Amino acid sequence: MPGRWSAETRLALVRRARRMNRALAQAFPHVYCELDFTTPLELAVATILSAQSTDKRVNLTTPALFARYRTARDYAQADRTELESLIRPTGFYRNKAASLIGLGQALVERFGGEVPATMDKLVTLPGVGRKTANVILGNAFGIPGITVDTHFGRLVRRWRWTTAEDPVKVEQAVGELIERKEWTLLSHRVIFHGRRVCHARRPACGVCVLAKDCPSFGLGPTEPLLAAPLVQGPETDHLLALAGL
């Protein structure tokens, strides 16, 4: 019903967005960063490696990397060839190696070897933009942040929370709809939903907890039995149970 959404007021949009966030919280009660890490430095490194790669691929790569490079100084003094060899499976390994060495050097020279906990300082580091900074702030320091990755941007546009393509504008628009304390969890929920249910080409509309509030309902199969096989991930049984299957 295109008319229903085109006539939506600002207040109605805020209410719908927050209702959808609550539904996502029910669908994904245990969300988390899917990159493996134990320290802010490890998360910064893993997030840099995740560009144009998958979390699964990064998580297969980082155990050996983290065992070899434990501190910012280790990265600052890394042998480039050795570092490139370790991170090669994540793709674009030459650029990423340069970013990691630069990251280590910047942390040693300007921050005493420690990852800073503010946006303005994080974005001055090599390889760290707002997306990476928000991942670090939200998951290593508990500071709310909205992570606009490919899934997040695709879904919030699909939901008509915003029409913006620029990640910074998406972050700002969503931040005005959802309470700040929810930002990090919202980011995880949306990304989980994009990976498991709301796929780019064939979303599982028929089993989606957001169906009644989604302007794009019908892009994928709306019949539950046809949509069910499209659901992916360890939460599949829970998601199908919510759909009555």
Curated annotation (Swiss-Prot):
Keywords: 4Fe-4S, DNA damage, DNA repair, DNA-binding, Glycosidase, Hydrolase, Iron, Iron-sulfur, Lyase, Metal-binding, Multifunctional enzyme. It catalyses: 2'-deoxyribonucleotide-(2'-deoxyribose 5'-phosphate)-2'-deoxyribonucleotide-DNA = a 3'-end 2'-deoxyribonucleotide-(2,3-dehydro-2,3-deoxyribose 5'-phosphate)-DNA + a 5'-end 5'-phospho-2'-deoxyribonucleoside-DNA + H(+). Its cofactor is [4Fe-4S] cluster. InterPro entries: DNA_glycosylase, Endonuclease-III-like_CS2, Endonuclease3_FeS-loop_motif, Endouclease-III_FeS-bd_BS, HhH-GPD_domain, HhH_base_excis_C, HhH_motif, Nth. One of its GO terms (biological process) is DNA repair. Signal peptide: none annotated. Its EC number is 4.2.99.18. GO terms for cellular component: peptidoglycan-based cell wall; plasma membrane. Residues 119-138 form the HhH domain. The keyword Protein biosynthesis does not apply. [4Fe-4S] cluster binds at C198, C205, C208, C214. Binds 1 [4Fe-4S] cluster. It holds the Pfam family HhH-GPD. CDD domains: ENDO3c. One of its GO terms (molecular function) is 4 iron, 4 sulfur cluster binding. It is an enzyme of class 4 (lyase). DNA repair enzyme that has both DNA N-glycosylase activity and AP-lyase activity. The DNA N-glycosylase activity releases various damaged pyrimidines from DNA by cleaving the N-glycosidic bond, leaving an AP (apurinic/apyrimidinic) site. The AP-lyase activity cleaves the phosphodiester bond 3' to the AP site by a beta-elimination, leaving a 3'-terminal unsaturated sugar and a product with a terminal 5'-phosphate. Has a preference for oxidized pyrimidines, such as thymine glycol (prefers 5S isomers) 5,6-dihydrouracil:G, 5-hydroxyuracil:G, 5-hydroxycytosine:G and urea:A. Belongs to the Nth/MutY family. PANTHER family: A/G-SPECIFIC ADENINE GLYCOSYLASE/ENDONUCLEASE III, ENDONUCLEASE III. HAMAP family: Nth. This is Endonuclease III. The gene is nth.
